[in-house]
Amino acid sequence: MPYYRRRVSPIKPGDPIDYKDVDLLRRFITERGKILPRRITGLTARQQRDLTRAIKQARVLALLPFINREG
């Protein structure tokens, strides 16, 4: 029977994901401004869904850029 390493979520299950917490949200977007997929972030499905909503809301409120044109 193969042994699979259990993945640990970078955000604790009870911690809220808020659109105002820009430092937390920046950890989950690329340098170009794209949202990282769940297989890279290691989040649960629920956390990834909440994170995506928070990032999109922060973009609409101009807390995060839609795209990053640096480089």
UniProtKB/Swiss-Prot annotation:
InterPro entries: Ribosomal_bS18 (IPR001648), Ribosomal_bS18_CS (IPR018275), Ribosomal_bS18_sf (IPR036870). GO terms for cellular component: cytosolic small ribosomal subunit. Disulfide bonds: none annotated. GO terms for biological process: translation. Signal peptide: none annotated. It comes from the Bacteria. Belongs to the bacterial ribosomal protein bS18 family. This is Small ribosomal subunit protein bS18. It comes from Acaryochloris marina (strain MBIC 11017). The gene is rpsR.
